Amino acid sequence: MLRHAFALEVKEGRTSEFRGNLGKIWPELTAFLDAKKMVNFSMWNVERIVFGYYETEDDFVFTDADKETVKAWEGSYGDAYTWVSTPFEEMRLMYHDFGIVRESKELIRHRVFITKLVPGAEDEYKARHDVLVEARGGKVTEGPDSNFSIWNAGGYIFGYNEIDTTMERDRTEEDRQGDIAWET
């Protein structure tokens, strides 16, 4: 399975227009996703920043015809948004811990985040997270976090995490202090 992400910024005062236009193309979009076997497609927003995520089979590529279809949809949007990521190009993967991907999403809760990085901090952020990936030594994480990825484009990081709710536990003060130490 391949994982993909994209990001947009809705122009000031145009959120209703953006959502309305998305609703107009939704039946066509979902048919396209089904035909291309693009699954687990989701979009979230924090204020005007929109983060999208989807999964495909390993041999997935956008054909020229696919790109033209997407461009036609964009035409129906007018200029309600601008791209944060580059269309049809992979966003930079900053971190991954794919763990065990649950086929059933019924007991999954999602954690999604969008954060503006300090200018020029992308490489340091990636290096810190590469240490975590290396420390796992290829070991599969059983949970509760699974299918966790952090992407980068336009000075932002975008996180997607599926959390198995049957494996969650109450966080301790030690957990919180560890988070603070990691983040600062």
What is the predicted role of each segment?
Residues 32-39, 56-89, 143, 163-184:
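An amphipathic, aromatic/His-enriched active-site/gating alpha helix that lines ligand/cofactor pockets
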Residues 41-48, 70-108, 151-153, 183-184:
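Glycine-rich beta-strand-turn "strand-cap" elements at beta-sheet edges
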